[in-house]
């Protein structure tokens, strides 16, 4: 059971949420008094409480979602709060639904979406994974961070062929290496205020690091927001090549490192928005004509469940008509379907841009 001090903090946080009438987070929408009372004393076997789940959303009332999972068990123990939020965010993934088994599908179905190189600047596909037997960020000890990094770096050092590369720990990193990784846009920074409030940045930079292959087309982030972020990317529009590289890497790593998986929710991640396939396939794409007709752009995006962001990701502007466009759906469909939907949508956008 949660201790009295934790419950007192929770009561205070709940009052703050209640009073915040202009707060639009999913946390506020779904944390009713009944649900709050039924969950406030619960504690996972690793010691996580409802406070770990909601504290970021309580501190940052402008959160979109407002909750994180401190460990894998939290998704089950605090399901009365997680499930409706997951259903709301992953539109159509009902509380009775079950995420399908992993299926990367026929990788030959993916192509170069822009063979002339007119529209697509770069292509990237990533997924997140959590290592079985370890909690997520807020509950990790410094020793666990280091132990995980050791496992990850030794696993990655076994990669061969195109995936062969080097691991760079953030701890003790020289200024030169740091600058080089920043210039390549590889280095991740300490978390933003949402992650800070969720206690996702403790013992920084212990256990954090970056692996990349010699061609700089394959990247693994260790202990950033998730235990592992596996990323395949390159200039141009060859989605097929990018996807195939990611799939072979994930399959290879999976043989050596068991990942946390949930029967109903698929692969588990720290933030419920990334559950399921955890896959985000994206392009940086120049669409000057559609940029001038934002309504049409949004209409096509909605039809193919695409998310349109500014050039530098969430909450940024499209610089020079360049957008970051990705698949929106991660749950209730396979990896293949998620990326195929994105490919179809991008092909359609290019077709319309050409016709305008």
Swiss-Prot record:
<feature type="domain" description="Phosphagen kinase C-terminal">
    <location>
        <begin position="119"/>
        <end position="356"/>
    </location>
</feature>
<keyword id="KW-0007">Acetylation</keyword>
<feature type="binding site">
    <location>
        <position position="225"/>
    </location>
    <ligand>
        <name>L-arginine</name>
    </ligand>
</feature>
<dbReference type="InterPro" id="IPR022415">
    <property type="entry name" value="ATP-guanido_PTrfase_AS"/>
</dbReference>
<comment type="similarity">
    <text>Belongs to the ATP:guanido phosphotransferase family.</text>
</comment>
<protein>
    <recommendedName>
        <fullName>Arginine kinase</fullName>
        <ecNumber>2.7.3.3</ecNumber>
    </recommendedName>
</protein>
<dbReference type="InterPro" id="IPR022414">
    <property type="entry name" value="ATP-guanido_PTrfase_cat"/>
</dbReference>
<dbReference type="GO" id="GO:0046314">
    <property type="term" value="P:phosphocreatine biosynthetic process"/>
</dbReference>
<dbReference type="GO" id="GO:0005615">
    <property type="term" value="C:extracellular space"/>
</dbReference>
<dbReference type="GO" id="GO:0004111">
    <property type="term" value="F:creatine kinase activity"/>
</dbReference>
<feature type="binding site">
    <location>
        <begin position="64"/>
        <end position="68"/>
    </location>
    <ligand>
        <name>L-arginine</name>
    </ligand>
</feature>
<feature type="binding site">
    <location>
        <begin position="309"/>
        <end position="314"/>
    </location>
    <ligand>
        <name>ATP</name>
    </ligand>
</feature>
<dbReference type="InterPro" id="IPR000749">
    <property type="entry name" value="ATP-guanido_PTrfase"/>
</dbReference>
<feature type="binding site">
    <location>
        <begin position="280"/>
        <end position="284"/>
    </location>
    <ligand>
        <name>ATP</name>
    </ligand>
</feature>
<dbReference type="InterPro" id="IPR036802">
    <property type="entry name" value="ATP-guanido_PTrfase_N_sf"/>
</dbReference>
<feature type="binding site">
    <location>
        <position position="271"/>
    </location>
    <ligand>
        <name>L-arginine</name>
    </ligand>
</feature>
<dbReference type="InterPro" id="IPR022413">
    <property type="entry name" value="ATP-guanido_PTrfase_N"/>
</dbReference>
<feature type="binding site">
    <location>
        <position position="185"/>
    </location>
    <ligand>
        <name>ATP</name>
    </ligand>
</feature>
<feature type="domain" description="Phosphagen kinase N-terminal">
    <location>
        <begin position="9"/>
        <end position="91"/>
    </location>
</feature>
<dbReference type="GO" id="GO:0004054">
    <property type="term" value="F:arginine kinase activity"/>
</dbReference>
<dbReference type="GO" id="GO:0005524">
    <property type="term" value="F:ATP binding"/>
</dbReference>
<dbReference type="Pfam" id="PF02807">
    <property type="entry name" value="ATP-gua_PtransN"/>
</dbReference>
<keyword id="KW-0418">Kinase</keyword>
<feature type="modified residue" description="N-acetylalanine">
    <location>
        <position position="2"/>
    </location>
</feature>
<feature type="binding site">
    <location>
        <begin position="122"/>
        <end position="126"/>
    </location>
    <ligand>
        <name>ATP</name>
    </ligand>
</feature>
<feature type="binding site">
    <location>
        <position position="314"/>
    </location>
    <ligand>
        <name>L-arginine</name>
    </ligand>
</feature>
<feature type="binding site">
    <location>
        <position position="229"/>
    </location>
    <ligand>
        <name>ATP</name>
    </ligand>
</feature>
<keyword id="KW-0808">Transferase</keyword>
<keyword id="KW-0547">Nucleotide-binding</keyword>
<dbReference type="InterPro" id="IPR014746">
    <property type="entry name" value="Gln_synth/guanido_kin_cat_dom"/>
</dbReference>
<dbReference type="Pfam" id="PF00217">
    <property type="entry name" value="ATP-gua_Ptrans"/>
</dbReference>
<keyword id="KW-0067">ATP-binding</keyword>
């Amino acid at each position: 059971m949660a201790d009295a001090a934790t419950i007192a903090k929770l009561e205070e946080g709940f009052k703050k949420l209640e009073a915040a009438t202009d707060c639009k987070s999913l946390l506020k929408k779904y944390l009713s008094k009944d649900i709050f009372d039924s969950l406030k004393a619960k504690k996972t076997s690793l010691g996580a409480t409802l406070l770990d789940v909601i504290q970021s959303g309580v501190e940052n009332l402008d959160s979109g979602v407002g909750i994180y999972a401190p460990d894998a068990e939290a998704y089950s123990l605090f399901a009365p709060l997680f499930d409706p939020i997951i259903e709301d965010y992953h539109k159509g993934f009902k509380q009775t639904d079950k995420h399908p088994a992993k299926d990367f599908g026929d990788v030959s179905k993916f192509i170069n979406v822009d063979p002339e190189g007119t529209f697509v600047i770069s292509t990237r596909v990533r997924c997140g994974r959590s290592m079985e037997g370890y909690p997520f960020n807020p509950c990790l000890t410094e020793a666990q961070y280091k132990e995980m990094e050791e496992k990850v770096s030794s696993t990655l050092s076994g990669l061969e062929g195109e995936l062969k590369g080097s691991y760079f720990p953030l701890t003790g990193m020289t200024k030169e290496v740091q600058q080089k990784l920043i210039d390549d846009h590889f280095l991740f920074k300490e978390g933003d205020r949402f992650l800070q409030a969720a206690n996702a940045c403790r013992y920084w930079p212990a256990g954090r690091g970056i692996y990349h292959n010699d061609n700089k087309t394959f990247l693994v982030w260790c202990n950033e927001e998730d235990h592992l972020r596996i990323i395949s990317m390159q200039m141009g529009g060859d989605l097929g090549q990018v996807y195939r590289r990611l799939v072979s890497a994930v399959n290879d790593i999976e043989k050596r490192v068991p990942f946390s998986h949930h029967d109903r929710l698929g692969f588990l991640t720290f933030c419920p928005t990334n559950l399921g396939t955890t896959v985000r396939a994206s392009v940086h794409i120049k669409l000057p004509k559609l940029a001038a007709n934002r309504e049409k752009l949004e209409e096509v995006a909605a039809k193919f469940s695409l998310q349109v962001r500014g050039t530098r990701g969430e909450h940024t502007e499209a610089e020079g008509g360049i957008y970051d466009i990705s698949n929106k759906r991660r749950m209730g469909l396979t990896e293949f379907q998620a990326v195929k939907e994105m490919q179809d949508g991008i092909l359609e956008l290019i077709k319309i841009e050409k016709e305008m």
